[in-house]
């Protein structure tokens, strides 16, 4: 009976390594606590976390509204992969244009997606205002907070319903459920709110509230597709969490010194970091980021793409890597790497120029 109750979701606990294990469980509890959520789900990568979130919220023929200033891999997932494999479409909007998010919402829209600090320019979006728009239309706000971490901002406090972090960065591949979204009242997510045939007719919204969202992903999507985080990597992430605040504090402090230096350099056209008063989103920096604006930002060197690449090739301390948030400082040319799937027009539309260089300060 004990085993039957576990498999029937009537009793919470470990069943099988693909779904959870004790080490992952501790990691998930700590992440949920850091973000102020009710539960979390750790998976094998940030890409899996994003993909699982979208697949849990939208089905074939449905739609997602997203900021256009996001990581190139997520942009490609929404623009090409999900339409081709799942029939889920997306509309990308200018987050700085007034009314853009609400204007893009359709009858079949199932979520709004933003990043706390956009990749690669670290632009800010008014989380609180976008959350109000999402809830007005009975859909959740999903926030990728990889660049910020809960040390800098906790999106759930400003109305976000689901928070995602990417693996290999400050924290790890994880989905956090705020527990605040009313899946039953929305009426837009019957696979969560109504009897689910995959579990003999239980309603996740009733049987597993307030953690219905991550329980649905764990019990259905993770169970059937298996992008599982290993216990060893969960252990490593737990070690990292012990020093998260200290590390991010030092990252931010070092980044501000580089931002100040580049802002005054004659060979630099522009620097994009939310702490700068010249940035359009600086007023949001004051509202959301009292502990600093992160350590990942871009600048535009005077010249063209070849100038940028020559500059990168001649750096002695920085490592040329697509990752961010490492203890060592990293550099990349976004237009030809992290956002290389985008067309030239899409790159410019996202604020990425041929001479844009992204830095991640260690």
Regions found by a protein language model. Give the residues of each.
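Conserved PLP-enzyme active-site core in the AAT-like
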Residues: 40-265
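Conserved C-terminal alpha-helix-loop-beta "cap" of PLP-dependent enzymes
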Residues: 248, 267-357, 361
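Short amphipathic alpha-helical segments
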Residues: 12, 38, 233, 237, ...
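Alpha-helix boundary recognition
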Residues: 32, 156, 263, 312-316
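Structural motif
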Residues: 35, 86, 266, 315-316
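Conserved N-terminal alpha-helix of the aminotransferase class I/II PLP-enzyme fold
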Residues: 1-51, 73-82
